[in-house]
Design a protein with these regions (language model features):
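Generic structural signal for well-ordered alpha-helices
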Residues: 1, 29-37, 70-81, 115
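Active-site beta-loop-alpha junctions enriched in small/polar residues
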Residues: 14-19, 55-62, 92-98, 130-131
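Short glycine/threonine-rich loop-to-helix capping motif typified by GTGT followed
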Residues: 26, 59-72, 100-109
Length: 178
């Protein structure tokens, strides 16, 4: 961090510590809070140059412990903005949709829906492929609701099964169009 500060660069702080990657809301805010305090108190690191990545993780895996990964990221982004003045939030958008690799349309739609929810709640920047973004207004409502269910609202096995069924339907339709 001293070298980064010496050159006047910003730093991206991943929500990892000695115990590993933060996967829950509580661990994300614990690690980000600790890192912020260390950077500010020990180095007087400019708060606007501290960018946190509170780990956007894969959803719709069928594993119950993954149900809250989408909402936990967004809640952590809100907490960072409310409690760590000046800090910013980033995240890699390919992660939450990884369970749908091979179905690019569903993955790209998930990225759009994720940003629609995460930006107003504190996500300042994202690591993404801009040429693969789908305009928000072109996302079919049924797919938007299914994705929101998996990422933010229902977060259960039924929501996952609904999105998987829609993804398969879309995949088959796209294959038939070829």
């Amino acid at each position: 961090a001293r070298t980064i500060l010496k050159y006047g660069a910003a730093t991206v702080v991943m929500a990892f510590d000695e115990e590993g990657q933060a996967t829950t809301y509580d661990r994300k805010i614990e690690i980000c809070g600790r890192a912020y305090r260390l950077l500010r108190e020990n180095l007087d690191f400019p708060p606007g140059d501290i960018i946190f990545d509170p780990n956007v993780l894969t959803v719709a895996t069928g594993m119950a412990e993954h149900f809250d990964y989408g909402i936990d990221f967004v809640r952590a982004a809100e907490w960072i903005h409310a409690n760590l003045p000046g800090a910013r939030v980033s995240g890699g958008l390919s992660n939450p949709s990884f369970a749908f690799r091979g179905n690019n349309y569903v993955r790209e739609t998930m990225h759009t829906v994720f940003l629609d929810e995460a930006i107003p709640r504190g996500m300042d920047m994202a690591i993404l492929n801009p040429s693969a973004m789908i305009p928000s207004e072109s996302v079919p409502e049924a797919l938007r609701l299914a994705i929101r269910g998996v990422l933010f609202t229902r977060r259960d096995e039924e929501a996952t099964e609904l999105l998987i069924a829609l993804a398969e339907e879309i995949r088959l339709r796209k294959e038939a169009e070829k």
